[in-house]
């Protein structure tokens, strides 16, 4: 059998792809620069191609290098899962669990989720990571997260997906916005006044999928960095927005006397989902957390 690349060599290449700097990549890998350079050169020899182009100013991956990095990330994540499998067989439902959640879900479930995980998985140390969908899916693929909670539709790229709940988006407007107050469907709304989260939030994409606002989606006045900011903009009668059902009965809306919340026809929807790698050794934990999330969301819908 021909010699195969080692996981260490692949790890060196992945780290270099993240830093594009040999000294920094060596520091992160806890080796000398010459050791890291030698490992990558040996990897290039084994694969029979140039992976990295170097000059005095720049380090960049070749097209082959980019493809190898993408595959290396999967192999390294699978290797981590393999190591975890042994521990999981001997000590199930114990240890650290890193869970990613998007910002348009996290605030509404975290308190109950932490309580239920503490009750049902007392030997699990839960670490929560909040970030936008693309970032947490990328971290899941790279093995930095064990599972993530996000909203579909979203490109899950061959990962294992389990639906939690489906929910509609509701119209939220200022009570003095007569046009929106009297609307019965999306067709009745003045979409030039639709307020959205900034790019990167999947809730923005879900709203836009049903609201063809054209070039106005590039208008900075339509963007908010967070749901509380978006609600404040609507409360000031700068426009209306569409919010998920999970947010409707929270203090963010319930105690704001300026706002009206109503269900409308043809409203877009989203599906909350729990996602992990197909190679995960944490299937038991996945099943428990999925059940917890289903019960939590059932109380919020």
Swiss-Prot record:
**PROSITE patterns in the record, alphabetically?**
HTH_LYSR (PS50931)
MF (Gene Ontology): DNA binding; DNA-binding transcription factor activity
List, alphabetically, the Pfam families matched: HTH_1 (PF00126), LysR_substrate (PF03466)
Which keywords accompany this UniProt record? DNA-binding, Transcription, Transcription regulation
Q: Which residues bind DNA?
A: 22-41
* InterPro entries with a match to the protein in the record: LysR_subst-bd, Tscrpt_reg_HTH_LysR, WH-like_DNA-bd_sf, WH_DNA-bd_sf
Which residues does the UniProt record annotate as the domain HTH lysR-type? 5-62
- For this UniProt entry, what's an example GO CC term? protein-DNA complex
Which function does this protein serve? Transcriptional regulator of the esterase operon.
Instruction: Family membership, please give it.
Output: Belongs to the LysR transcriptional regulatory family.
Q: Which PANTHER family match?
A: TRANSCRIPTIONAL DUAL REGULATOR HCAR-RELATED, TRANSCRIPTIONAL REGULATOR OF OXIDATIVE STRESS OXYR
Name of this chain's protein: HTH-type transcriptional regulator EstR
Species of origin: Acinetobacter baylyi (strain ATCC 33305 / BD413 / ADP1)
């Amino acid at each position: 059998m021909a010699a195969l690349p080692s996981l260490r060599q692949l790890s060196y290449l992945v780290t270099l792809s993240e830093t594009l700097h040999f000294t920094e990549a060596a520091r992160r890998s806890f080796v000398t620069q010459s050791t890291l350079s030698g490992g990558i050169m040996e990897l290039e020899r084994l694969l029979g191609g140039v992976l990295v182009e170097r000059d005095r100013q720049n380090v960049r991956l070749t097209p082959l290098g980019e493809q190898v990095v993408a595959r290396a990330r999967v192999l390294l994540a699978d290797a981590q899962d393999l190591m975890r499998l042994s521990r999981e067989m001997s000590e199930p439902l114990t240890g650290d669990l890193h869970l990613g959640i998007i910002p348009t879900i996290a605030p509404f479930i975290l308190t109950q989720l932490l309580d239920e995980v503490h009750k049902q998985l007392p030997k699990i140390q839960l670490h929560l990571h909040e970030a936008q969908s693309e970032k947490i899916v990328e971290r899941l693929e790279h093995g930095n997260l064990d599972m993530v909670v996000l909203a579909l539709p979203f490109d899950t790229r061959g990962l294992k997906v389990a639906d939690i709940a489906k929910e509609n988006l509701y119209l939220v407007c200022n009570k003095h916005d007569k046009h929106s107050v009297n609307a019965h469907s999306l067709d009745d709304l003045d979409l030039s006044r639709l307020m959205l989260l900034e790019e990167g939030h999947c809730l923005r994409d879900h709203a836009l999928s049903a609201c063809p606002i054209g070039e106005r989606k590039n208008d900075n006045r339509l963007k908010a960095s967070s749901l509380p900011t978006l609600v404040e903009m609507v409360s000031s009668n700068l426009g209306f927005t569409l919010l998920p059902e999970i947010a409707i009965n929270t203090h963010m809306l319930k105690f704001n006397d300026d706002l009206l919340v109503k269900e409308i026809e043809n409203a877009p929807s989203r599906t909350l989902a729990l996602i992990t790698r197909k190679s995960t050794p944490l299937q038991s934990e996945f099943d428990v957390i999925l059940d917890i999330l289903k019960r939590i969301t059932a109380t919020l819908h």
